[in-house]
Design a protein with these regions (language model features):
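The conserved beta-strand core of Leucine-Rich Repeat
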Residues: 1-305
Length: 305
């Protein structure tokens, strides 16, 4: 073929579907690094819904120090600026198509940024929450009112759960999955029973769990299909003056009550590394001590990241 007959095809002339296929191999940092500004066709490809079903920010952690006053953390300004740029660019490109949003548990998102995010991904179905410290009651409640399609929530434990779960009950009619990371007491269980009685999947893995609280869940959540208490520190509190004791195995009463479930996921093995870690941390997992990303695991496939 003569040189004059050759036709050089430019990158910007590539078919949109091909560009989308290429961009699917990019991570979130690359997608938001400016490739959408190259030309019109690249921006169209960058905005394709296929790229934005899930926004995974689980690799992002805040650079912070603990302080004695609320919100008990001080976040470095540069860290905040990086998150703001990445999140706002992603939300602009996604054009409201994000259905799964994943934050790192050590990411300290501001109240204003959470509200901004909710307004720009109203179709959200699954949320993995960041740390609570900088999020106010008004902010999360406003977000939940927007996220009416929410079905699944993974959240750090919270001292006052009723206002949050009531908001979910009032606004998220298809809500069915809840994972709580951190302390889970009888008050939290009673709140779920009151406001989310139709929840079908509940994961409490790697938490401290009192036997009576577990029995309440099994007795009262009649729509529950899947319960994960793997690696939990299960405590029995007998009447005084007897001391509380750590249960090394489930008794027949619990097994009988759990037999109605489709899946009852447990692990209480002395040889299990995660069980050892929960015991060593006294039921309050210090995830920062362990391998990066180990907090994402869950024996329930729909909750694993």
């Amino acid at each position: 073929m003569e040189e004059s007959d050759r036709v050089a095809r430019r990158w910007e002339d590539l078919d949109i579907d091909i560009l989308v296929k290429i961009f699917q191999s990019f991570d979130i940092i690359e997608l938001t690094s400016g490739i959408a500004t190259v030309c019109t066709s690249w921006r169209m490809a960058c905005c394709d819904p296929l790229l934005w079903r899930t926004l995974d920010l689980s690799m992002m952690k805040s650079n912070f120090i603990k302080i004695p006053l609320e919100p008990y953390v001080y976040v470095d300004a540069r860290s905040d600026k990086t998150l703001n740029h990445l999140l706002k660019t992603s939300l602009s490109l996604s054009q409201g198509n994000i259905m799964t949003l994943i934050f790192h548990f050590n990411l300290y998102v501001s109240d204003d940024l959470l509200t901004y995010t909710a307004e720009r991904c109203p179709r959200l179905r699954r949320l993995v929450m960041p740390a609570w410290n900088r999020i106010k009651k008004t902010g999360i409640c406003k977000a939940i009112r927007i996220w009416q399609d929410l079905e699944s929530l993974t959240m750090p434990s919270i001292a006052n759960p009723p206002y949050l779960l009531e908001e979910i009950a009032n606004n998220c009619k298809n809500f069915s999955e809840l994972k709580v990371m951190g302390p889970f007491d009888n008050f939290f269980a009673a709140t779920i029973i009151t406001y989310l009685p139709k929840v079908r999947v509940l994961s409490l893995r790697c938490s401290m769990l009192v036997k009576d609280t577990l029995i309440s869940i099994l007795d009262e959540l009649r729509n529950l299909e899947v319960l994960n208490i793997s690696h939990c520190l299960l405590i029995e509190i007998p009447p005084p003056p007897a001391p509380r004791r750590i249960m090394r195995e489930l008794d027949q009463c619990i097994l009988d009550k759990a037999s109605r479930l489709r899946e009852f996921l447990t692990c209480m093995k002395d040889s299990c590394l995660m069980c050892q870690r929960t015991r060593n941390d006294e039921g309050l997992m210090r995830w920062y001590k362990y391998e990066e990303g180990v907090w994402k695991a869950d024996e329930v496939s729909s909750l694993s990241l």
